[in-house]
Amino acid sequence: MEEHSSIVFPLEFKELMRLKKEIDKNPEKWEEVKRVINPLEFASCDIAVAKVQPISRAFFKMIELSEKLNPLPETPVRTLHLAEAPGGFVQAWNWIRKPLGLTDETTAISLEKTTFDITWKRLLEVSRFWFSRPTLQTGDLMKKETRDTIIEEYTREKIKAWLITGDGGFDFSEDYQNQETKALPLILSQMLIGLRCLDKGGCMILKIFDCFTLPTIQILWVFCKVFGEFRIVKPDTSRVCNAEKYIIAKDFKGVDKNLDIFLTKIDGIINEYEKDASFHIETLFDTGPISKWDTIDEHFKTSFEISIKRFINTQINWIQKGIDMMNSDKIIENTKIKTANVVKWCRKYHIPINREYFESHRLCHVNRAEEASSLSYHSLRQSQSQSQNQNHRIFYQKPVLKSDQQEPTPPAFLLRHRSFDDS
């Protein structure tokens, strides 16, 4: 088993790798424990607190992430969702846009699982009654032919996407230690397609994992340079023990000469990996200040170190808690506290409450006002947009870190735009 090294946070990296080795000793038991200690696990289960029936947990993540995109366009837009199956992000986007009466042109692409119908089975069922159904496609984003076909479609028509999401990942349950290096080629593929197909002023959401290696840090640097606003968040509904985080980038500046050269190089790197899966990606830049950690600009490094270190420490604390529970052979779940967590989350994001859950668990039910449907969703989102706009103005006055979530989730990583060739 190949183990990667860290160029930042050596102590935290060593501790996290130690804990992940403990997890690898008993992955089956860990699968149970990680769900038990997750504060918002009850949002999505057989009988869930939330009344919405999501295709996957990604639905709830996208509900949270979309709040960071406010204000949303009040006219139909084009959206592209990469590595999307089974379709949670698309379902959430439809949920968000439906009250506005807008019919966006939505396309979802994912790796085919046996057949097209199996890959998109749940989204095909859910979207049957949507006014505007998404265009569903299959394809391997790691193959140049697939990438070129997608990019050609968006560049040929001159109608690029306002929103692009990349939620790709793998089953890391057999090897938690090498998430970052294994996920890197897919992350690069999604970034390449996204930046080629995104319209000026558009937004991108991209899932990443650990941030210990130079290529991952360089990806963050690129997003910082080519977007007007950039942050990293971990949604509350993302399981606390995993490493997944999301880049949320707004106000895309477009593809200039420097970015075009960079994306062409990334295409070549992915092609090399496709030929030889053992190909090790050491850097995305051969020259310039960004080619080495020591020469990256201090503003970026400071913001990165403060924010990412908090993500890591939070993850370490939760994993240690899970391992302690796993070793004690006493897997205890506090249903009432976890239910209260989910109810609070549903209130925050205006998700209706499921009465059946409270009845089946013999818990006190919330009042009927809290189980109301999304009829007032539009007005609620408008009021929240105004509030968030005020926060954005404050951010531009002082472009440092901003806390998007309460503990135990660390603050988001926010940076203001600088030009791509600005070191």
Task: Give the ranges of each region predicted by the language model.
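Gly-rich Lys/Arg/Thr-decorated short loops/hinges at beta-loop-alpha junctions or inter-strand turns
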Residues: 43-46, 166-179
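Conserved Class I SAM-dependent methyltransferase catalytic core
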Residues: 177-232
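Beta-strand cores of modular interaction/reader domains in eukaryotic scaffold and signaling proteins
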Residues: 78-83, 107-108, 165, 203-207, ...
